[in-house]
A protein has these predicted regions:
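Active-site-proximal alpha-helix that buttresses catalytic centers in soluble enzyme cores
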Residues: 1-84
Length: 84
């Protein structure tokens, strides 16, 4: 079963993290044919972490997880950390 994991930076501001969760819910509704499972995760400053997000997908039955980076610009994390 295919899963989509939305990965955002994460923020100390809870409202920003909540916006990522709202986006994941919208993706879940619009991508249901291709991705039966959709979760969000964060690189830092918020939970779930990326490994936890992958575990959540697997727990829900995923056999394949597609990572969707959600960053607004090409900073250090986008260029160096995410590809690793």
């Amino acid at each position: 079963m295919n899963a989509l994991l939305l990965v955002a930076h994460g923020s100390r501001r809870q409202q920003s993290n909540d916006e990522v969760t709202v986006l994941a819910n919208k993706l879940r509704a619009s991508c249901h044919e291709d991705y039966r499972i959709v979760h969000s995760s964060f690189l830092e400053l918020a939970t779930p972490s990326i490994p936890e997000g992958i575990e959540n997908c697997i727990r829900d039955g995923a056999t394949r997880v597609t990572i969707l980076p959600y960053f607004l610009n090409s900073g250090t994390h986008v260029v160096n950390d995410v590809p690793e």
